[in-house]
Amino acid sequence: MNHAFIQSAPQNTTFDQCIKCTVCTVYCPVAKANPNYPGPKQCGPDGERLRIKSAEYYDDALKLCTNCKRCETACPSGVKIGDMIAVARGKYGKKPLNPKLVRDFVLSHTDFFGSIATPFAPLVNAATSLPLVKKLMHKTIGVHDHKTLPKYSHGTFRRWFKQNCTSQPLYQRQVAYFHGCYVNYNHPQLGKDFVRVMNAMNIGVRLLDSEKCCGVPLIANGFHSKARKNALHNVKHLTAMVNDYHAPVLSTSSTCSFTLQQEYPHVLGVDNSQVVDQIHYVTRFLLKEFMSGNAPKMKPVHKKVVYHTPCHLERSGNVMFTIELLKMIPGLELVVLDSECCGLAGTYGFKEENYEVSKKIGSHLFDAIQTSDADYAVTDCETCKWQIEENAHLETIHPVSLLAMALIDEPRA
């Protein structure tokens, strides 16, 4: 039991609003794919009524939840089902000392391992791609050997920004960029595309003086106390940025922005009220700028793309901003997929006990993409990108990178 987290965890009493319609269970991707999962109604409001009486009613079946929040999206009564489950796992979930604890630590502490791996990225990437290493990780710590581990960049985005973006403060308008772990350690090109798009709109980019992982992989793997420390750190630096520069804070990760806005107060008990209204997912900001007349010059992009909606973007209500933004790219043929969860759910699908369920959840999406005859898949979430590329075998790009592809002007950053 996590006694430190219990002291700060928020108390969720929205279970009283549950009308027992079970629409959450119908909408849950795990309940459809795994008969061992009781479903969000039983794990959430039904279970919470018992857990507030005694911790002995905690059930390890809660670990089967992906934290996709689709149950909350579906709930007609506004019950915070996913939050209940996440908080319960943080409060009562046991973490016995065994090899899977090592796996969960490695998968969730992205800053620690990213900072170690990026200087040696070619070696690390080569090693983790070896079948022998994959088999060893499967047998020892339980990372499924059929999964392709994310590749690290040889050098971080923050390092590139420091070396190449000294002119950013010269722009009259400024935005702050919460780049997250994925851009910093795995795919700096997305951050570079973000800077290029902003500069094409005559907007400069600033980074926080310091940022840590948003905390979502820590929450998912039961390290709630560490996630809360990260949240307090980030809120401190977000507040300083907003107060000093009056700049909106943008994220290119649908999960990072959702976590900064929603998970901090509702799951971790961290007050973000001073900055939450200034935090935006990037496509929301971009569409507003485009519609107000501040759109960059773009050339036609004669490509067919299929768009997959990430679960956290749907939960945050920002889906239409991305779709409408993509429609503004000239020449682009856009197909919006009728897809649900991709199944990876951050670190969930990397675990050997979840691998088959993860693939089953995403099978409809993979089939739709493979039969689409598209040039690219587009999604706002990095882990959706990994899952699609691995299982549907189609290059998957971010909406911001697609915009950068359409820009006429050369990058100025």
What are the residue ranges of the model-derived segments?
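A ubiquitous short alpha-helical element
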Residues: 52-56, 70, 105-109
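Short, intrinsically disordered, charge-biased short linear motifs at domain edges
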Residues: 2-15, 51-62, 199-201, 328-331
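Iron-sulfur cluster-binding electron-transfer modules in prokaryotic oxidoreductases
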Residues: 6-7, 81-413
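Iron-sulfur cluster-binding cysteine motifs and their immediate structural context
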Residues: 23-48, 64-92, 259, 381-383, ...
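Short, charged low-complexity linear segments at domain edges
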Residues: 1-9, 36-56, 317-325
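Cysteine-centered iron-sulfur cluster-binding motifs in ferredoxin-type domains/subunits
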Residues: 12-31, 57-79, 114, 185, ...
